[in-house]
Amino acid sequence: MDSGSRRYCLGNGRSTYTVLMTTPDYTPYVAYARGQAALRRQQAAERYRLAWHVARQIAEFLRREYRPARIIAFGSLVHPDVFGLHSDIDIAVEGIPWPEYLRAWNGVEEQFPAFKVDLIDVDIVSDLMRQRIQEEGQEL
């Protein structure tokens, strides 16, 4: 590496890239890219905290209005390393009969528009999905 070259490590939280720049004029661009990556990580962390807050509010709403047997958060919400700026909230419920389940889902969408919410009826999903919810899910 000659005196006019520098190595820079750039990352997005999931992977890191090493870039060899042959001119010191790229230094401001690298600093900007690093700053943007840090900002996205901070925004994702804030959205993650907000998502958990909203998930707990959804659970309170469902308990008050529909009295499900269980309410379980799963998906990216229980995996902070994969939760991102565009992640939704996945919530599984047990014990809400049809068509009350459809009313519950509609109520959740109307009451909590800040996030896309997938409200899953555990009683009708595949065995594989039910197993995934049971293994990774967290009770709300």
Go through the PLM ranges and name each one:
Residues A73-S76:
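Glycine-rich beta-strand-to-loop/alpha-helix junction loops that act as flexible
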